[in-house]
């Protein structure tokens, strides 16, 4: 079964997410960003995000060996990253294939610059 990918609209970061240095964040933006940064405060999750970003899209089964963790542990950490909006998954058979959420990393970078 072939998946259909839709083009992602490209917008300027300034149009959606002002830098914390440019203007104060409202409560909703601050909470969303805090959840994302908190998810990255764990070394395993940070490594998982970097592995997923480097591969563009990766099967959860291929994340076990690089981080030397069990499937339940990797599943827990990818769930945390997904709940923070940093990665998105697509279930294919027994496994989930992960990719970086299109705007998530850019938003974190842009909010600090």
Can you say where each PLM-predicted feature lies in the sequence?
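N-terminal leader segment of winged-helix/HTH proteins
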Residues: 1-40, 84, 106-107, 111-112
